[in-house]
């Protein structure tokens, strides 16, 4: 799950979560811009969206449904392309009533401690 739908560092605590975590918004932007990584992420989000009538919990199980929400939130914020932003927001709308992951937003927009 971590390398298919990465999330922001600070959300997961396992070794795998730390290994595959995205450090910041700039790294998320580079991830999206990479033809392989960004392409695979988009393809996989489209595949999940294709499961109409099911919840993220039905499709992914727990806690991966929460990780998916975190991933969508991160990349909706990172997307500079309107079609990318629409894709991630469409998935947030379909599975989470349009509500992004609060903790991801807090971590993204918090000021670094000095």
Please report, for each region that a protein language model flagged, where it lies by residue.
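Short helix-capping/linker segments at secondary-structure and domain boundaries
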Residues: 10-16, 77-87
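C-terminal end-helix/capping segment
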Residues: 21-40, 102, 109
């Amino acid at each position: 799950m971590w390398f298919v739908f990465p999330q922001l560092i600070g959300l997961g605590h396992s070794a795998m979560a730390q290994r595959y975590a995205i450090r910041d918004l700039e790294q998320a932007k580079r991830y999206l811009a990479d033809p392989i990584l960004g392409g695979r992420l988009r393809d996989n989000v489209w595949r999940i969206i294709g499961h109409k009538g099911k919840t993220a919990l039905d499709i992914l199980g727990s806690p991966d449904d929460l990780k998916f929400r975190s991933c969508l939130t991160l990349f909706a914020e990172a997307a500079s392309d309107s079609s990318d932003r629409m894709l991630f927001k469409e998935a947030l709308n379909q599975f989470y009533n349009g509500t992004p992951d609060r903790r991801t937003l807090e971590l993204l927009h918090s000021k670094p401690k000095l």
